[in-house]
Design a protein with these regions (language model features):
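N-terminal prepro-regions of secreted/extracellular proteins
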Residues: 1-51
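Boundary regions of SH3-family modules and the immediately adjacent low-complexity/disordered segments
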Residues: 34-48, 104-135
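A structural signal for short, hydrophobic beta-strand segments that form beta-sheets
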Residues: 47, 51-56, 76, 85-92
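A structural detector for beta-sheet-dominated domains
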Residues: 53, 61-63, 81, 107
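Short, structured beta-strand/loop micro-motifs enriched in basic residues and often containing a Trp
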Residues: 57-70
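SH3/SH3-like (including bacterial SH3b) beta-barrel domains
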Residues: 67-81
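SH3/SH3-like beta-barrel superfamily modules
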Residues: 78-124
Length: 135
């Protein structure tokens, strides 16, 4: 684990006065290290784009869903190897494990192909994230 405890890290990322009220995504709080949790808390929107922490090796699909209309699996076109990424915009697609149907449009780290990442793999506090453009 990192140099700081969870409480100390919250104070650094969220500001000492607001650390107690800092909202952490459930995925980040339970399944990542303190360092990636800090990244998760650093999501922001700028010019309609999202910059946010995400699951390592998250799959990028050709369309915003896991399956095609005929029931076959959707094609994985690339992956996000990094744990902090750029997302151009969002769309509504198939429901996923995050309890919604928001998918973020981005390009991958392996081949540079564009596609969609399920919001469950992006450490936003709400979906769609405020300030991010709809595709």
């Amino acid at each position: 684990m990192g140099k700081f405890s969870g409480a100390a890290l919250a104070a650094i990322v969220c500001g000492a006065a607001t650390a107690a009220s800092c909202a952490w995504p459930a995925q980040a709080a339970t399944s990542t290290t303190a360092a990636s949790t800090a990244t998760a808390a650093a999501c922001y929107a700028s010019s309609g784009n999202l910059y946010c922490g995400n699951a390592a090796n998250a799959p990028i699909y050709a369309t915003p869903g896991y399956t095609k209309p005929n029931g076959n699996p959707e094609t994985v076109v690339d992956r996000l190897e990094t744990t902090f990424s750029y997302f151009k915009c969002y769309v509504s697609g198939q429901p996923h494990g995050g309890g919604n149907s928001i998918w973020y449009h981005t390009y991958g780290d392996q081949t540079g192909r564009w596609g969609y990442v399920a919001a469950v793999n992006v450490w936003t506090s709400t979906d769609p994230y405020p300030g991010v453009a709809r595709c």
